[in-house]
């Protein structure tokens, strides 16, 4: 199942404990308060901030954890979170008021660009790691999926955007040349990119569509077997 999921990710690329006064820390995410919020955001090109209860849990928080851990693949993006409590010490309520946040709609995601505090871009889609990743990508942010490589993502994007066979052959050759310089830890993933690109060159666009169907069925079959 793991191998199928990894192959699926590459194909799609082609197409603690709480401290007093802070929210629970999530790996890959930076906890912010009313002071650090204004210090940290201007230092990064993009900052995705999750506004939530002080101690979030459940399925949506699990999706956020996946997203935060995957953010290490982006040089331009910082993932952060603000825990808001409207009782007791009433932590970070000023930020909730500033952005007119409805606690019934938590978690709420805002994307800040170039330190602009007044015009953040709100996310209104499903709280799923993959959906948020696609939204970030649509806003010009690179955020690789597991097993993906930025250099080959760019190459694959160019490959899929052209239809001329000679142009595709040229891009494939470029990828093969880059493979020789790739780190040992990246070679296996790079080879998968080249393998898929070669298949598309030989068989056409139908290969990608058929492969998605095949891998999806394989994953579903494995899940059914595991559930027995």
UniProtKB/Swiss-Prot annotation:
InterPro entries: ERp29, ERp29_C, ERp29_C_sf, ERp29_N, Thioredoxin-like_sf. PANTHER family: ENDOPLASMIC RETICULUM PROTEIN ERP29, ENDOPLASMIC RETICULUM RESIDENT PROTEIN 29. It comes from Gallus gallus (Chicken). Homodimer. GO terms for cellular component: endoplasmic reticulum; endoplasmic reticulum lumen. This is Endoplasmic reticulum resident protein 29. Keywords: Endoplasmic reticulum. Does not seem to be a disulfide isomerase. Plays an important role in the processing of secretory proteins within the endoplasmic reticulum (ER), possibly by participating in the folding of proteins in the ER. Pfam families: ERp29, ERp29_N. It is found in: Endoplasmic reticulum lumen. Its main location: endoplasmic reticulum. The keyword Endoplasmic reticulum applies. GO terms for biological process: protein secretion.
